């Protein structure tokens, strides 16, 4: 369309130019004077047609002005249209939306709490698997087993559905074509003031499946929870192999475990904020005490810490850091140092799982830890912080 306007403008200019030529009239050559053969300079009085030329040029200006304005207007119209289209294309950003509404969130959490409570009451693993998976499932399965062996074993803490103090749903594109698992993090507060808040991490693996609980983590006192987006906006998930956070996420259990073994002397201690980490303080003290006690009875103990379930789940905070839920498996290997001696277990759960008081060959004890870390963005002055932790025993076996 702009090209047609340009052609029309050129045609109008052409006819305008022809009109000017007609108004100017014919060009005349001034004759020489008959008085002599010499050529003399022409003066203004010898140019009788100049007055008409000036008049003609005045008309030319009158003709050209509207034609030029029309041309500029037509071309300007073409240019404006093109500019608007370009701007519209440049500012077209992908529309984001959250995976669930507030009503859906309340229904999901309420149903989860009800179903898990029913499974806990009946100690029904099959029913539990309908709504719980991963590390949270493994810890509860062992608890059901222990409850079946002894009435002295207490059930695990109930899931608190309300009130929800933090809800962080995953963002997705409104134009999403390939379905991806949905993730949801939320914090609930118990009506019992003696019980701290708990963080739940849920995922929906496919459109036909329910949201399942992967992590149920007790938040530690004295740690400020990072600022996160409001529920209506949500946030993006953090890939386990991302390169913009301060550490590789799969290495968190190993590095933190090294700190549990070596304390402030660990080479990784400077990357973690340990000043308000009550979990670290209790575990480091407990491991040191066990090592000293076993040394007195001529036995050794070795503590190993590694990544448990490979499903590391992370979500971005407002400062571009990450809330990272990760599984850490602790393995304690105890061996007697003298022939004919044996090592014994003292905890109730360990005795029930071993079906014995000890072993002459040694013991292998495994625990599952569900941990929540705040990992700052790479290059930040902030340190990695442990925000929450929950632990449960998995197994006790005699060494062969």
Predicted features and spans:
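Bacterial signal peptide processing site
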Residues: 79-82
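Core segments of small alpha/beta cavity-forming domains
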Residues: 92-150, 227-300
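Membrane interfacial helix motifs at helix-loop boundaries and amphipathic/re-entrant anchors
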Residues: 1, 89-94
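Surface-exposed, charged secondary-structure patches
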Residues: 150-197, 299-340
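Extracytoplasmic/luminal low-complexity segments enriched in Pro/Gly and acidic/polar residues
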Residues: 277-400
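Short beta-strand edge/turn micro-motifs at domain boundaries
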Residues: 1-26, 84-85, 190-257, 317-325, ...
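C-terminal motif of bacterial Sec signal peptides marking the signal peptidase cleavage site
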Residues: 74-77
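Cytoplasmic C-terminal tails of single-pass
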Residues: 22-71
